[in-house]
Amino acid sequence: MQTVSSYGVELRKQNIPVRQTLEIYRSAVSYLTEIYEQVWEKLAEIPDAKRRFNAAEHLVHTTKKNPARFDFDLRFPKMPSYLRRAAIQHALGSVSSYETRMDLWEKSGEKVGKPRLAYENHAMPVFYRDVMYREEKEGKDEAYLKLYDGHDWKWFCVHLNHTDMEYLRRNWSGKKASAPTLEKRHHKYFLRFSYTEEVTLTKTPVKEQIICSVDLGINTDAVCTIMRADGTVLGRKFINHPSEKDRMYRTLGRIRRFQREHGSAQSRGRWAYTKRLNIELGRKIAGAIVKNAEENHADVIVFEYLEMQGKISGKKKQKLHLWRKRDIQKRCEHQAHRKGMRVSRVCAWNTSRLAYDGSGSVSRDLKNHSLCVFQTGKRYNCDLSASYNIGARYFIRELLKSLPVTERSLLEAKVPPVKRRTSCVYADLKELHLQMEILKAA
């Protein structure tokens, strides 16, 4: 399979016309969007995407054999051909999306929510190699970009952030990068490079697999358990970043006090800072999970399928909204695939509520919420028990799925809890493995 990774390299502050280039490109996209909205009925009659694009370009660009219908070349003289085509493609996509949404709205018979075609856009130009972007000699933190200085398109030498370039040389040397895209974040400009890799995911049989089951929590960031198909636990790891969470909760307290006195209108910058802290925390958690799985030679990383719907209320509302569970799983999936590992998800119902030893529901410790008490009186870490159950559910599903129907029915009769994925626990996996060994020996 293919994996696509990207990295943004910061453009160091200097006197180069990046803003003027961005403005003229967005003006071109807006102008083209207006044009293609007018002639969309004729363009829509062309089914082939390539022919439609050629017809759209002929409307605005004059050649020796083709006089243009619209004055795009006069409004935007000497615009590089690749940049012009990128603007055409963006405008065609905007109009096509608008027309599709309009058709769906008209068919639905709704009177509200009418789609609107936005001419003001946030399009970012792509600097195609050789014609818009040239690399400096290897080892130098410089590149050449073709930019618009207000009068003409000229080549400008731009200085790139040394730390970012060192990262690319260290991790992506020898791999081909796509044409960089301009990006603006936090009042800074970046060139984002994308890299495509061919990776082969592991095909280890289920009975020989080693998995890393992960329970994502709010109080503890993540608990990982390394497990075999027979239920043998090879390792456990608690991942927690208390200082990062403390910093984030401290900023949330400041926001709360500020909004109490001044309202929420002026707290936008504070929320943006908190969001960036939360994103960085998600990156660290995902990196730690994948690193632990790789060190233990895991074939699969197993998560809960976390779906939170409905209104969240109460004192934990803010924490739950900032819980980046999907982002962590998405980052882990990308990093795991790059290393050849697979990612799987299991039903999340009752993983924390049921004790891993099969004794039934647990009671949370009132003084320490991370601990729970089993019905046998045993005190145990609740997240660790949940990670055992997550790994067990994965193996129960995969082991039963690969068996013939008659053999599966026989095992389900001997171990009834495995029929329901919402209630099976780690003890059921141990019992299932025992019954499979007995059946194999018979």
Residue ranges and their predicted role:
Residues 1-442:
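Nucleic-acid substrate recognition interfaces
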